[in-house]
């Protein structure tokens, strides 16, 4: 996938060149970790926890019993801490959560699992991913992203590793932190799903050749 800050025919180094999407995930890391923790502590879905965080930041979610959201009211201890954290991130760091960025949560869970159990594997936030055939690349585009390109060459500085990206597609609106964690374990362990979408993670140099 060619990002807005990338050009065909230019050689990039994954260690030095980070896509805007990955930069934003890194910027929001602490905030998204707080959302994950709230889901883990309460058992509510990650989407519900994220939406609650959005409402806290935009001022429609309050702590008072008569005005507070039912999520906060049902979990007074964890909810109060979560409320305070979201307000602090918003006020001090000028962070706002947006609905279209909810998928960033999945990347945070994936990276957390990698750091805890699979440190020897390449980070999705500090490597590039590509597909070894056009079929998988086009299947990826069906999930909302286009602008697919063929990679002319990849010069890895470590061994390339294959993973099944279809594990991400198993996440539902009702999935909580623990459930998504199990999906991430399936991904990092190298297990394949019936409808596998094989991607390769690699750190090193890469160059885009042409648009498909």
Tell me the role of every PLM-derived stretch:
Residues 102-125:
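Short linear interaction motifs
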Residues 2-103, 124-126, 135-148, 155-212:
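Conserved NAD+-utilizing ADP-ribose enzyme module
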């Amino acid at each position: 996938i060619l990002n807005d800050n990338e050009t065909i025919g230019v050689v990039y180094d994954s260690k030095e060149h980070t896509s805007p999407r990955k930069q934003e995930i890194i910027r929001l890391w602490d905030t998204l970790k707080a959302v994950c923790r709230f889901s883990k502590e309460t058992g509510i879905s990650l989407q519900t926890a994220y939406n609650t965080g959005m409402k806290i930041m935009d001022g429609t979610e309050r702590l008072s019993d008569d005005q507070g959201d039912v999520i906060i009211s049902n979990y007074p201890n964890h909810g109060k801490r979560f409320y305070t954290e979201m307000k602090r991130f918003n006020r001090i760091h000028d962070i706002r959560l947006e609905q279209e960025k909810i998928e960033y949560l999945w990347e945070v869970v994936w990276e957390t699992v990698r750091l805890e159990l699979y440190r020897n594997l390449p980070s999705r936030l500090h490597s590039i991913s590509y597909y070894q055939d056009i079929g998988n690349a086009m299947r990826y585009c069906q999930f909302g992203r286009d602008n697919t390109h063929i990679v002319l060459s990849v010069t890895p500085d470590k061994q390339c590793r294959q993973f099944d990206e279809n594990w991400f597609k198993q996440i539902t609106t009702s999935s909580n932190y623990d459930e998504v964690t199990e999906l991430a374990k399936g991904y990092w362990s190298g297990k394949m799903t019936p409808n596998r979408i094989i991607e390769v993670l690699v750190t090193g140099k890469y160059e885009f050749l042409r648009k498909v």
